[in-house]
């Protein structure tokens, strides 16, 4: 499976926004410091996230970004798709005339990987930023008890 840093970092940055601000804009510098993602990379990601109406921006000394919707309404798949990330587990595409190995037939495990891709997409479609936040809260409270 291939999910590049672009998709992972976009989800991390959006989760950071969801966790650390409710109404006040958050600067990319703040996100960069907390998440360890370069500002230049965040600028590229947030350009696409804003274009896809997942965040709103404001300029000025107290400017930054806020989520355009509540965290429970932002699906992880929409974040990943917004930054042009495709989740692929097979080389070939269904609409392609050539199959997995460049021949006219699919490889023997094609359906396995194709089904896995469908499950991964379904997972990201069924989970929101809220799910990330609540899982983090549960995990951190477990660590405190130990």
Where does each model-flagged region fall?
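Short amphipathic alpha-helical interface segments
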Residues: 10-22
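Key DNA-contact positions within bacterial/archaeal DNA-binding proteins
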Residues: 40
């Amino acid at each position: 499976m291939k999910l590049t840093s672009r998709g992972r970092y976009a989800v991390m940055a959006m989760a950071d926004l969801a966790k650390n601000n409710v109404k006040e804009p958050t600067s990319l510098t703040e996100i960069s410091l907390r998440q360890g993602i370069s500002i230049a990379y965040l600028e590229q990601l947030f350009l696409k996230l804003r274009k896809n109406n997942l965040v709103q921006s404001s300029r000025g000394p107290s400017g930054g970004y806020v989520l355009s919707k509540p965290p429970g309404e932002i699906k992880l798949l929409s974040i990943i798709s917004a930054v042009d990330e495709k989740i692929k587990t097979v080389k070939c595409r269904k609409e392609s005339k050539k199959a997995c190995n460049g021949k006219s037939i699919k490889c023997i495990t094609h359906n396995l990987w194709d089904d896995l891709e469908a499950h991964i997409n379904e997972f990201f479609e069924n989970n929101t930023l809220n799910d990330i936040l609540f899982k983090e809260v549960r995990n951190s409270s477990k660590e405190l008890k130990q």
